[in-house]
Amino acid sequence: MREPKNAKVLSRLENVLVTQLDVNNFSSIKKSVEKAISHFGRIDVLLNNAGYSVYSPLESTTEEQIHNIFNTNVFGALEVIKAITPIFRSQHNGMIINVSSIGGKMTFPLGCLYYGTKYAIEGISEALTWEMQSIGVKVKIIEPGFTATEFRVEEGAGKHYAEYDNLKQKLYEDLLPKLKTATPPQKIAEVILQAATDESDELRYPTGDYVVEWMALRSKVDDATFLATHRKQMGL
């Protein structure tokens, strides 16, 4: 994990090794993989869960924000997968679980950067199944909705434009009630455990309140109808 000092509870558990890993630091990725192999002798499952979001008009974001979110949410995940693949290949066994989001299947206002990273994770994960199957490795995607965690959310650090204020207000009016009834992280953890142990070839695991019904609606109607329905629900 990024800050091992925060892992007091985990460190007390049996058969748990906590190492420092920052997905934006390839050296720390390599060292963590090496320590895991040295300690356990093998690695069975990789869970890619690092990420954060930026909610802002694209025009109000900075170049640094754009690069940082893709570095963490996408390129960091790729680096971890690349570092661990030789281990899985030598074992001819393993599993990659990538945490995506409902935002990897549909979007909400002002989240083009975040949802862009999640759509990337969806495509990367599905494409990886082809090559990973050749070395005995399964790939799974977890697709949670709103989750009750201390998830990092940034606003745009660039210039403010009043033309987007109404959209921003409507977004928070729509999202805040959903956040109050967000899915407990324990339920997401249960789905991750299921994905890791059910021995199926299932690729995607949508989970959480609203997610299944939204995805069902998304698959049943054309883009114009879905977007119009969503705009109407948000009063836009």
UniProtKB/Swiss-Prot annotation:
Any one GO biological process: phosphatidic acid biosynthetic process
Matching InterPro entries: NAD(P)-bd_dom_sf, SDR_fam, SDR_oxidoreductase
Transmembrane segments: none
Tagged with keyword Calcium: no
Localization in the cell: Cytoplasm; Nucleus
Coiled coil: none
UniProt keyword list: Cytoplasm, NADP, Nucleus, Oxidoreductase
UniProt-listed Enzyme Commission number(s): 1.-.-.-
Binding residues annotated for NADP(+), in chain numbering: 22, 49, 82, 114, 118
Active site (catalytic residues): 100 (proton donor), 114 (proton donor), 118 (lowers pka of active site tyr)
GO CC aspect terms: cytosol; nucleus
Molecular function GO terms recorded: acylglycerone-phosphate reductase (NADP+) activity
Pfam family, one: adh_short
Keyword rRNA-binding: no
PANTHER family: SHORT CHAIN DEHYDROGENASE, SHORT-CHAIN DEHYDROGENASE_REDUCTASE FAMILY PROTEIN
Protein family (similarity comment): Belongs to the short-chain dehydrogenases/reductases (SDR) family.
Protein name (Swiss-Prot/TrEMBL): Uncharacterized oxidoreductase SPAC977.08
Organism of provenance: Schizosaccharomyces pombe (strain 972 / ATCC 24843)
